[in-house]
Amino acid sequence: MKAIFITLEGPDGSGKTTVGTLLNQKMTEAGIDFIKTREPGGSPISEKVRNIVLGIGNEEMDPKTEVLLIAGARRQHVVETIRPALAAGKSVLCDRFMDSSLAYQGAGRDMNMEQVLQVNLYAIEDTLPDRTYYLDVPAEVGLARIAANKGREVNRLDKEDITYHEKVQAGYEKVINMFPERFMRVDATKTPEEITETILADILRQLA
């Protein structure tokens, strides 16, 4: 069985974390040799950067600082976690990757998406996902889910208003148009179990 790099993307409240947990279980049951990781984070240094970027109290952070910090964390994650796993024949399941930077920082912060893309391509070099699952849900539905989930850890980006989250969604649409061959859009208004089964079936096809 070949090793592939899989990423989960979607706006806040799309159910990505829940689906990631279920997918981890189902992929293990299917006998797939893989690791599960996340961004920002995924390595000791990158997790420290995550705490800075998402920490409540860092609202004054400049948008370009945000881009550069996340790109730096991503570089370390690629070098320390993702590439070694792929080289060892293990697939990688990652909660967010470069596309999040394009949507959240590029579009959400009204930055030049091409510049954000180039910064990230410099960081990751040739380590692009083989398959990206975009969990598609309206911004208002996602934010309502966040508000209803009292046990969810709230980060700095969750506190942004609906306009920001709508920009993020529009940004994702641009990213999907940039890389249509690796994206699969998944209806995230369905149950986590239904979403997981849809994604797992496609992963098994990709690995065949």
From Swiss-Prot:
It catalyses: dTMP + ATP = dTDP + ADP. The keyword Nucleotide-binding applies. This is Thymidylate kinase. Pfam families: Thymidylate_kin. Coiled coil: none annotated. Keywords: ATP-binding, Kinase, Nucleotide biosynthesis, Nucleotide-binding, Transferase. It comes from Listeria monocytogenes serovar 1/2a (strain ATCC BAA-679 / EGD-e). ATP binds at G10, P11, D12, G13, S14, G15, K16, T17. The keyword Transcription does not apply. The gene is tmk. Phosphorylation of dTMP to form dTDP in both de novo and salvage pathways of dTTP synthesis. One of its GO terms (molecular function) is dTMP kinase activity. Belongs to the thymidylate kinase family. One of its GO terms (biological process) is dTDP biosynthetic process. Its EC number is 2.7.4.9. One of its GO terms (cellular component) is cytoplasm.
